[in-house]
Amino acid sequence: MTDSFNAKQFLSTVTSQPGVYSMYDLSGTVIYVGKAKDLKKRLASYFRAQVASRKTEALVKSIHHIDVTITHTETEALLLEHNYIKLYQPRYNVLLRDDKSYPFIFLSGDAHPRITSHRGAKHAKGDYFGPFPNGYAVKETLALLQKLFPIRQCEDSVYRNRSRPCLQYQIGRCLGPCVAGLVSDEEYQQQVEYVRLFLSGKDQQVLNQLVERMELASRALNFEDAAHARDQIQAVRRVTEKQFVSGDREDLDVIGVSFDAGMACVHVLFIRQGKVLGSRSYFPKVPVGTELAEVVQTFVGQFYLQGSQMRSLPGEILLDFTLPEKTLLAASLSEQAGRKIQIQTQPRGDRARYLKLARTNAATALVTKLSQQSTVHQRLAALAELLGIQAINRMECFDISHTMGEHTIASCVIFDGNGSVRAEYRRYNIEGITPGDDYAAMDQVLRRRYGKALEEKKIPDVVIIDGGKGQLGMAKAVFEQLEVPWDKSRVVLLGVAKGVDRKAGLETLFLQPHGEGMALPPDSPALHVIQHIRDDSHNHAITGHRNKRAKVKNTSALELIEGVGPRRRQSLLKYMGGLQPLRNASVEEIAQVPGISGALAEKIFNALKH
C-alpha cells in the first residue's frame, strides 16, 4: 500500500453487497479489477497479515486507492468485471490478448442467395454457420462448398451488373444466376438447400436427396442430370468420410490447458453439429505468481463474456479443469445466451476423446511457443550486446512506401521481449511534403510518433530506421529537436541500409550518420531480429500503400462531381461493383442506386463519359 491509502478506514466504508472493485496505483492507472459476492469480505482479505500469494503482496503494495461499483447480483458483477478488464487491461489481471470476433459462413436471404464469410454483428437477413477458428478455415470451407454445390460467392454489386456469366460459371463452380436463362430458380434453390443442410451437419440428408434425384433423372432418361447428381454424391461422400463425427451431433467448445515456465496455453476446439470445425490456441498474459485455477477461470469468463455478441455460444463447454465458480459462470453464460449453457469438467465417451485432443494440442502449442520465445530472447539479447545496452524491452521500426511520390504511407511496427506486438502496429498517411521526399516523410512520422508524452512502458529502447546514413542523420536531428517530458536520450537510433543487390544478409548497420557502418555475418542472431522487424515494417507499409492507392483510384473520378459526397460515392461504388461498371452503366441504371436522383444520375453519366 502507498502511504496515502488507509486500508482500515477504507474498509469501514465498504458495503457487504455484491459488486466490482477497481484498484489504482499512484499514477491513477487501474492495476487490478475484481468482483465479489460480498465486497467487504473480499476486499478485507487483501489486507490480512498473511496474504495468499506473492502476486497479491505485490498488488497490495501498489494500491493508492480503490473504487467500488455495487451491482444487484453476483452474475451482474461478473459481467461488469469482464467489461472493466477489457476496458482497462490491468497488469495484475490475467488478460486474453486476442479478442477478435470469429468468422462465420453467411448464406444470404436473397432471391439467389450468396455464400460468403462474415465477421461482426449479424444484421443481414440470412443464415449464419460457425463460428470458425480463423479466416483460413472459412476460406477452405468456402472453396470446398464451391466444388460441391455451385452457388454464387460474388458480391451483390457484381451479381446485379453482369450481362454474361463469369469464369466461375465456365469452370462449373457457379450456376450463373446472374444471367437469365442459365439456371431455373427451382434448381438454384435446390443447391442452396443442399448447402444449408451440409453446413448444419445433415450430410446423410443431402446424400439421400441427391440419390433420389439421380434415380428420378435416370427413370426419366435424363442421363445428364443423373450424371451431375452422381458426381455430387461421390464428392460429398469423399468429404464426409474424412472427418470424425460425434454421435450426438451437438454444439461443443472443448478447452484444454497447459501451463509451464510461467506461461499458459489454452486450446479451444470448436465442434458444431458433431464436427470439428477447427481449433485455436491462446496465450493469455499471466502475472507472476498467478495460480492456474485463476488463469482458467478468468480466461473462460473473458472468452465468452467479453464481446459475446460476436461469439456463438455452444450448448456445452468441456473443460479439463475444475472451476471454482463454475455454477456462477454457467448462470452468467446462460443469461447472455438466453438459453441453458452447461459447463462439464468430467466428460465420457466422445467428449473425453475431444478433451484429450484439446489437452494434447495445448501442450504442443505451448512447447512451440516457449521455443520461439527463447529464440526471440536470444536474438534480442545479442542485439542489446551489439548496441551496448542492458536489455531491449521495446523496439520500433519505420518504413516509407509510395509510388512515384504518390499516396505516401509510413509504417511503424513494434517488438517487445516476446516478439511482434501486432495490436500496436500503426500506419500514418503522409501529407504536405514534396512528392517522393522520403526524408520529409520520415521526419513527419517521427515527429507525430514521438513529439508527445509517452508512458514509461511505451518508450522504445531501440528505433530502427529503414534507410542509410541520410535517413539516420535526419532521425537524429528530429530527436534532438523534440521537447518532450520523457527521456529521449535512452533511445538508440539504428539505420539499416540494404546492400547493392538488396539481398537479405547484405545489410549495413549505422549508429552514426557518418563513417562506414558495420556488416554482421548472415548467421548473426542480432541481424536476424533486425531483418524480422524490418521486413514486417516494409510489408505493413506496402499493404497500407496499396490499400490507399486502390481507394483513391476508385474514388478520384467521382470526387470532382458536384453533389456526390463521400456517402454517395460509397453507395455508387458498392451498388455498381466498382468504378468500371459505373462507367459502363446507363443513366437509368445509375438512377437505381439508392439516394441518386434522375438529374444527378445524368450528371454522373456525363462526367464519367467526358
Swiss-Prot record:
Residues 16-94 form the GIY-YIG domain. GO terms for biological process: nucleotide-excision repair; SOS response. Keywords: Cytoplasm, DNA damage, DNA excision, DNA repair, Excision nuclease, SOS response. It is found in: Cytoplasm. The keyword Cytoplasm applies. Residues 204-239 form the UVR domain. Belongs to the UvrC family. The UvrABC repair system catalyzes the recognition and processing of DNA lesions. UvrC both incises the 5' and 3' sides of the lesion. The N-terminal half is responsible for the 3' incision and the C-terminal half is responsible for the 5' incision. Interacts with UvrB in an incision complex. This is UvrABC system protein C. It comes from Sodalis glossinidius (strain morsitans). The lineage of its organism: Bacteria, Pseudomonadati, Pseudomonadota, Gammaproteobacteria, Enterobacterales.
